[in-house]
Amino acid sequence: MIQQESRLRVADNTGAREILCIRVLGGSGRRYASIGDVIVATVKDAIPGAGVKKGDVVKAVVVRTAKEKRRPDGSYIRFDENAAVIIKDGGDPRGTRIFGPVGRELRDKRFMKIISLAPEVL
């Protein structure tokens, strides 16, 4: 469950290490984001000389949340951390690698490129 001011780890190789959620996209009253939701964020920590710099405003899709997510079959999925992947306006990832597992909900939201790059889909 991601909301404004939530900090997330970046799970790709764009050079950003940590981002801070500015806005959850999807309507004016939308308060929380879960796996597969798109957020607007700012880069809080980045590797020097990388593609993104500290202070850049980016779009990202949430790939892992510490808050459990209920699946249609009644099972629950949760991760140890909150993590996101920085994306372009078209929905494709800006990086070329994804680190760590991602949720199966990304397939339902049509983020196929992220699914194909991920080492594990849970």
UniProtKB/Swiss-Prot annotation:
Alphabetized UniProt keyword annotations: Ribonucleoprotein, Ribosomal protein, RNA-binding, rRNA-binding
Any Pfam family: Ribosomal_L14
One Gene Ontology cellular component annotation held by this UniProt entry: cytosolic large ribosomal subunit
SMART domains: Ribosomal_L14
Domain of life per record: Bacteria
GO molecular function: large ribosomal subunit rRNA binding; structural constituent of ribosome
Function: Binds to 23S rRNA. Forms part of two intersubunit bridges in the 70S ribosome.
Subunit and partners: Part of the 50S ribosomal subunit. Forms a cluster with proteins L3 and L19. In the 70S ribosome, L14 and L19 interact and together make contacts with the 16S rRNA in bridges B5 and B8.
Entry protein name: Large ribosomal subunit protein uL14
Species of provenance: Salinispora tropica (strain ATCC BAA-916 / DSM 44818 / JCM 13857 / NBRC 105044 / CNB-440)
Gene from which the chain derives: rplN
